[in-house]
Amino acid sequence: MVSKKNTAEISAKDIWENIWSGVSSLLDFFAVLENLGVVNDKLYVSGLLRKVWLCYSCISVIKCVWKLIKLCKVKFKIDQRLDGEGNGLVKDKLINFKKKYNEHIRHITAALLQDLSYLMVLIYPGTRLFKRLSNIITLCRIIV
Protein backbone atom coordinates (compact mmCIF):
# COMPACT_ATOMS: atom_id res chain seq x y z
CA MET A 1 0.00 0.00 0.00
CA VAL A 2 1.36 3.40 -0.97
CA SER A 3 1.35 6.00 1.80
CA LYS A 4 -0.68 9.18 1.45
CA LYS A 5 2.46 11.34 1.39
CA ASN A 6 3.87 9.44 -1.57
CA THR A 7 0.72 9.86 -3.64
CA ALA A 8 0.63 13.63 -3.01
CA GLU A 9 -2.99 13.38 -1.88
CA ILE A 10 -3.90 16.35 0.28
CA SER A 11 -7.62 16.25 0.94
CA ALA A 12 -8.19 13.08 2.94
CA LYS A 13 -10.82 13.29 5.71
CA ASP A 14 -10.13 12.01 9.18
CA ILE A 15 -12.16 11.83 12.39
CA TRP A 16 -11.24 15.39 13.42
CA GLU A 17 -12.45 16.70 10.08
CA ASN A 18 -15.83 15.05 10.72
CA ILE A 19 -16.02 16.55 14.21
CA TRP A 20 -15.03 19.94 12.81
CA SER A 21 -17.80 19.72 10.19
CA GLY A 22 -20.35 18.81 12.87
CA VAL A 23 -19.39 21.77 15.05
CA SER A 24 -19.52 24.03 12.02
CA SER A 25 -23.03 22.84 11.14
CA LEU A 26 -24.23 23.35 14.71
CA LEU A 27 -22.83 26.87 14.86
CA ASP A 28 -24.33 27.67 11.46
CA PHE A 29 -27.70 26.50 12.77
CA PHE A 30 -27.50 28.81 15.79
CA ALA A 31 -26.35 31.69 13.58
CA VAL A 32 -29.41 31.25 11.36
CA LEU A 33 -31.67 31.13 14.42
CA GLU A 34 -30.07 34.30 15.76
CA ASN A 35 -30.47 36.12 12.44
CA LEU A 36 -34.13 35.11 12.33
CA GLY A 37 -34.61 36.51 15.82
CA VAL A 38 -35.63 33.15 17.30
CA VAL A 39 -32.70 32.98 19.74
CA ASN A 40 -32.49 35.57 22.49
CA ASP A 41 -29.52 36.52 24.65
CA LYS A 42 -30.75 34.46 27.62
CA LEU A 43 -30.22 31.27 25.62
CA TYR A 44 -26.60 32.21 24.97
CA VAL A 45 -25.76 31.87 28.68
CA SER A 46 -23.93 35.20 28.91
CA GLY A 47 -22.59 34.98 25.38
CA LEU A 48 -20.96 31.58 25.85
CA LEU A 49 -22.07 30.31 22.45
CA ARG A 50 -20.91 33.53 20.79
CA LYS A 51 -17.46 33.07 22.37
CA VAL A 52 -17.32 29.46 21.20
CA TRP A 53 -18.31 30.59 17.71
CA LEU A 54 -15.64 33.29 17.74
CA CYS A 55 -12.96 30.78 18.84
CA TYR A 56 -14.13 28.30 16.21
CA SER A 57 -13.96 30.94 13.49
CA CYS A 58 -10.48 32.05 14.53
CA ILE A 59 -9.19 28.47 14.63
CA SER A 60 -10.77 27.77 11.26
CA VAL A 61 -9.13 30.84 9.71
CA ILE A 62 -5.74 29.81 11.13
CA LYS A 63 -6.27 26.28 9.80
CA CYS A 64 -7.05 27.57 6.29
CA VAL A 65 -4.05 29.90 6.30
CA TRP A 66 -1.80 27.02 7.43
CA LYS A 67 -3.10 24.81 4.59
CA LEU A 68 -2.55 27.63 2.10
CA ILE A 69 1.03 28.08 3.27
CA LYS A 70 1.74 24.35 2.90
CA LEU A 71 0.14 24.20 -0.56
CA CYS A 72 1.99 27.29 -1.76
CA LYS A 73 5.31 25.83 -0.59
CA VAL A 74 4.67 22.66 -2.60
CA LYS A 75 3.51 24.68 -5.61
CA PHE A 76 6.69 26.76 -5.40
CA LYS A 77 8.81 23.58 -5.43
CA ILE A 78 6.87 22.30 -8.44
CA ASP A 79 7.52 25.59 -10.24
CA GLN A 80 11.23 25.29 -9.46
CA ARG A 81 11.32 21.75 -10.88
CA LEU A 82 9.47 22.88 -14.01
CA ASP A 83 12.05 25.61 -14.62
CA GLY A 84 14.91 23.10 -14.53
CA GLU A 85 15.91 20.61 -17.16
CA GLY A 86 14.11 17.32 -17.24
CA ASN A 87 12.26 14.62 -19.10
CA GLY A 88 9.08 15.57 -20.99
CA LEU A 89 7.05 12.90 -19.18
CA VAL A 90 8.15 14.20 -15.78
CA LYS A 91 7.26 17.75 -16.80
CA ASP A 92 3.79 16.62 -17.88
CA LYS A 93 3.23 15.01 -14.48
CA LEU A 94 4.47 18.14 -12.74
CA ILE A 95 2.10 20.29 -14.79
CA ASN A 96 -0.80 18.04 -13.76
CA PHE A 97 0.25 18.31 -10.10
CA LYS A 98 0.46 22.08 -10.48
CA LYS A 99 -3.10 22.21 -11.83
CA LYS A 100 -4.30 20.04 -8.94
CA TYR A 101 -2.59 22.26 -6.38
CA ASN A 102 -3.97 25.41 -8.02
CA GLU A 103 -7.47 23.94 -7.69
CA HIS A 104 -6.87 23.06 -4.02
CA ILE A 105 -5.58 26.57 -3.37
CA ARG A 106 -8.78 28.01 -4.88
CA HIS A 107 -10.96 25.74 -2.70
CA ILE A 108 -9.09 26.58 0.48
CA THR A 109 -9.19 30.29 -0.36
CA ALA A 110 -12.97 29.97 -0.75
CA ALA A 111 -13.17 28.24 2.66
CA LEU A 112 -11.04 31.03 4.11
CA LEU A 113 -13.44 33.57 2.64
CA GLN A 114 -16.37 31.83 4.31
CA ASP A 115 -14.58 31.67 7.68
CA LEU A 116 -13.65 35.34 7.46
CA SER A 117 -17.29 36.11 6.74
CA TYR A 118 -18.21 34.32 9.99
CA LEU A 119 -15.73 36.51 11.83
CA MET A 120 -17.23 39.62 10.24
CA VAL A 121 -20.60 38.71 11.76
CA LEU A 122 -19.05 38.52 15.24
CA ILE A 123 -17.00 41.73 15.10
CA TYR A 124 -18.59 45.14 15.49
CA PRO A 125 -18.60 47.36 12.37
CA GLY A 126 -16.36 50.41 12.43
CA THR A 127 -13.52 48.81 14.36
CA ARG A 128 -10.05 48.56 12.89
CA LEU A 129 -10.20 44.76 12.82
CA PHE A 130 -13.51 44.88 10.92
CA LYS A 131 -11.96 47.14 8.25
CA ARG A 132 -8.89 44.91 7.91
CA LEU A 133 -11.02 41.78 7.60
CA SER A 134 -13.09 43.54 4.96
CA ASN A 135 -9.93 44.23 2.94
CA ILE A 136 -8.75 40.61 3.32
CA ILE A 137 -12.16 39.32 2.20
CA THR A 138 -11.99 41.53 -0.89
CA LEU A 139 -8.54 40.11 -1.69
CA CYS A 140 -9.81 36.52 -1.26
CA ARG A 141 -12.72 37.22 -3.60
CA ILE A 142 -10.28 38.48 -6.22
CA ILE A 143 -8.21 35.28 -5.88
CA VAL A 144 -11.23 32.98 -6.09
UniProtKB/Swiss-Prot annotation:
What are the UniProt keywords, alphabetically? Membrane, Peroxisome, Peroxisome biogenesis, Transmembrane, Transmembrane helix
Q: Is this entry keyworded Mitochondrion?
A: no
Annotated membrane topology: Multi-pass membrane protein
Which sequence ranges are marked TM in the entry?
Answer: 18-30, 52-73, 109-131
Compartment(s): Peroxisome membrane
* Main localisation: membrane
Claim: Transmembrane is one of the keywords in the record: yes
GO cellular component terms, semicolon-separated? cytoplasm; peroxisomal membrane; peroxisomal-mitochondrial contact site
UniProt GO MF annotations? peroxisome-mitochondrion membrane tether activity
Tell me a GO biological process for this protein.
Answer: peroxisome organization
Q: Relate the assembly described in the record.
A: Homooligomer. Interacts with PEX11, PEX25 and PEX27.
* Role this protein plays: In concert with the three peroxisome divisional factors, PEX11, PEX25 and PEX27, controls peroxisome morphology and abundance under conditions of peroxisome proliferation. Maintains mature peroxisomes in actively dividing cells.
Protein name in the entry: Peroxisomal membrane protein PEX34
Gene symbol here is PEX34
